[in-house]
């Protein structure tokens, strides 16, 4: 087990030998030569958000709320493409926006979660896709409600440091308070919801804060056992964002954080988004990643629209060059496909 002090020394070191030693340890501990991915459809239910993050282009004051028939059409088409994950995403607390609320009311819904529940249920009844929801902070009761129609759910921790709430990254984003995010991730554990979380590298955090964030995820998982994967995501500059002059993390920074994440989190899958790391993603296989995350043959990444998904054939070539077999997975990892972790309806659908 690596300590926080050892982790910090590693991040500060410029020694190639220290990297090679840890890579040797990871290789010795890793028996599988598979790297997984989920073939998905990205459904941006609504692109308004109460948070105004310094690195985000998803939020739009002139929001679009997808209509039910629009989502039905995307899901039906995704089914023909062989997609098995429906990624439902919208901004946090969109009900705070009176215009969004009014649109939902006109369609006969009391709020966005009722709307989401209905489209998720439709997805389960009419396609072979399984819903995965990522929509910001949710309460215990809201998580419990959505558990009935989700195979898994997600929320990026991003960073466990409250200091970042006073920086350009999160000063206008009340939902990025790490206490709120940790509480939700823990509530998901209490409810036995298979969960995806992660850290965001390069938004002004210190090396110590990166390490603390990974150890916080480890602490939560040790208590509840529900974190199926952790995303190590790199900040990318986008034109027009408040942080457009910030420096992106270097490949070495990412390489080291992936190594540490693998060693600290042990049995949790480590994911790096391939569309944000086209030039370096292949190298990160050597650092310990074992999942490429969601990749869509149909829809773009609406959070990072400037970064197209690689073709699945391209991912296969990337993986095989380092001896890895590309393996498709569901949005819920295999070890969580039990009655303990899934609603009866979801479990029956998977087993069928």
Curated annotation (Swiss-Prot):
The EC number of this protein is: 4.3.1.32
For this chain, the family text in UniProt reads: Belongs to the radical SAM superfamily. CofG family.
GO MF term (any one):
transferase activity, transferring alkyl or aryl (other than methyl) groups
Protein name, please? 7,8-didemethyl-8-hydroxy-5-deazariboflavin synthase
- On whether Endoplasmic reticulum is a keyword of this UniProt record, the answer is no
Pathway annotation: Cofactor biosynthesis; coenzyme F0 biosynthesis
What gene codes for this chain?
cofG
Entry's PROSITE patterns?
RADICAL_SAM
Q: Which NCBIfam families match?
A: F420_cofG, PRK06245.1
Which function does this protein serve? Catalyzes the radical-mediated synthesis of 7,8-didemethyl-8-hydroxy-5-deazariboflavin from 5-amino-5-(4-hydroxybenzyl)-6-(D-ribitylimino)-5,6-dihydrouracil.
**Record: residues binding [4Fe-4S] cluster:** 49, 53, 56
Q: Which reaction does it catalyse?
A: 5-amino-5-(4-hydroxybenzyl)-6-(D-ribitylimino)-5,6-dihydrouracil + S-adenosyl-L-methionine = 7,8-didemethyl-8-hydroxy-5-deazariboflavin + 5'-deoxyadenosine + L-methionine + NH4(+) + H(+)
Which cofactors does this protein require?
A: [4Fe-4S] cluster
Which enzyme type, at the first EC level?
lyase
Xref: InterPro entries? Aldolase_TIM (IPR013785), CofG_family (IPR019939), Elp3/MiaA/NifB-like_rSAM (IPR006638), F420 (IPR034405), rSAM (IPR007197)
Domain (Radical SAM core): give its ranges.
35-275
Q: Name one Pfam family in it.
A: Radical_SAM
The source's domain of life comes to Archaea
The cofactor binding remark recorded in the entry reads: Binds 1 [4Fe-4S] cluster. The cluster is coordinated with 3 cysteines and an exchangeable S-adenosyl-L-methionine.
Which UniProt key words apply to this protein? 4Fe-4S, Iron, Iron-sulfur, Lyase, Metal-binding, S-adenosyl-L-methionine
Provenance organism: Methanococcus maripaludis (strain C7 / ATCC BAA-1331)
Assembly and interaction partners? Consists of two subunits, CofG and CofH.
Q: Does the keyword Mitochondrion belong to this entry?
A: no
